[in-house]
Amino acid sequence: MNGQANVHLCVSQPRLWDAENPELYRCSAYLYKDGEQLDQSEDLFGFRTIKWNVKGFYVNGKETLLRGACVHHDNGVLGACSFEDAEERRVRLLKKAGFNSIRSAHNPASKALLDACDRLGMYVMDEFCDNWLVHKNPYDYAEQEFCQWWEQDLTAMIKKNHNHPSVIMNSIGNEISELAIPEGQELCRKMAVLARELDPDKAVTLGVNMMLCSMAAKGGGIYGEKKDGKENKNGSQTMDNLPTSAFFNFLMNKMGGIIEGAAAKPAADKATEVAISYLDIAGYNYAASRYEMDGKLHPDRVIVGSETLPKNLYKNWQLVKTFPYVIGDYMWTGWDYLGESGLGTVRYKSFKKPGEDAPIISGGCGVIDICGKLRPETQWNRLVWELTDIPGIGVEPLTHAGEIGSVSMWRDTDAVASWSWEGYEGKKTKVTVYASGAIVELLVNGKSYGKKKTKEYKAVYPKVTYVPGVITAISYDSVGKEISRTSMTTAEGRTRIHLTPEKHALRPNSQDLCYVNIDLVGGNGVTKSTEDVPITVVVSGAGSLQALGSAKPNMGECFFTNTHTTYYGKALAVIRAGNLSGKINVKASAPGLEDQFVELEVLG
């Protein structure tokens, strides 16, 4: 025996796996010698089929539109750590927000993440890397490292995915500008061939940035091409002098919609046609402007919006529904992340004041923040995807009343789902109502601010006076019949700390986590958005405090101390089990507030 055995099993009429019904089977293997069991291994897997063509993307024969979220590899306050519980929580909340697919931008997904996607039902576009021959940042994977390791690393990624029914696409790269030149095109061909040889079941794709490729074809570029950056005294370039991906994002913000326009030019098509011909599904980054025309120019091409702006979801989704060869849309991003600091952060002049001038550490562009809180835009997404008819309300923070924020391409609002702004009575703010009805009405304590027609499932009320009480949004159809309504209430009474653990039992494996949501609430249990204080968390017993933080972009505080200031009345503590059974006692305290306690149990 050479250490490998192949066994063929037949499962009659298997229950098929998909994102709505994630049916899994368990395979157990045992190793014996002379009748004695030496070892055993178990793995979960699922049965499903996928097929794609210009008529659509099919899972188990059913056409499936991909409601996608680009997701980076970090886990917010935990940093770049992957825990089973962290990944399961992320997938669970992404599903709650309406997503049915994630793109692991721009690194291969961890086993823990894929296991969670298998269990909970989430399609995955697993992405290999962010660069091939051209550097985007100092000390990245490009050039020598890539050339030496890409075959081994790509092989490892694809073999890792073999038993995961959640993985439907293997992406071999992101925004590779050298696709415009023969060297990059040949690499694309080789990588696509290898990916298909290793796993012919899954589609091969790549996130193509048409504008970057068009520039590279003309001898220019954003990143490390020879004509970029500054030369040193010897006439050569160093990575410290070259533009980085942060520079590209800054440029995109300044250019606004120009990138979509550049993508629509004939030069962009010419620069990318060869490389895209090697892909099963063409990933378009910020190129929805090409969807309709490429159905005519390239009638055999299947397209996915591999990276898009969240604010463009309505327009993009209409195109997805209209053109069957466009199989889905992946917004940047579904979940906020550490790095690319301030990419989507709405900036105010008050950020320069003492105490508010700390560096921004998060991207700020996720429709779910780094602590896992769903922002108001997620309700808009669900309305666009026709998953609900309940309206949503987004209130521009009254803590910045009178200030004009500098918005980003990636996030054009920092609205909060709150009508609790103590100390700002009488101040005016902008309120956005998200609704699928033709008409909406906004009321504060029964006083109507009028009915408005919706545009792209939104209606904006620019000057709403804050008065404590109840704010209500009502969605009507075109003849004035009420479809649905939603309300938010002001916090009342004395402030207290409220702790909400997401589970109470952990295993003694030193890996299990419990997320404890911390809110400053009034007597009616509603969060107070203006009463931010430093919260101290002390953990004793059979566990420890792994992280404590908030979603504030410019916090100036560490996630790994036991004190952190709330943001809009919220913070998040992550408790980690030890390797012994017992009780975990969690105490939260803040100046002037009564201590609060919660007890968890480690069972084993």
Feature roles, as predicted:
Residues 170, 193-197, 204-511, 523-527:
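Substrate-binding clefts and catalytic carboxylate motifs of secreted carbohydrate-active enzymes
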Residues 12, 32, 36, 40, ...:
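Active-site mouth of glycoside hydrolases
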Residues 125-127, 132, 345-353, 489, ...:
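Flexible glycine/proline-rich, aromatic-decorated loop/lid segments
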Residues 1-111, 116, 120-121, 168-169, ...:
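Secreted/periplasmic carbohydrate-active enzymes, especially glycoside hydrolases
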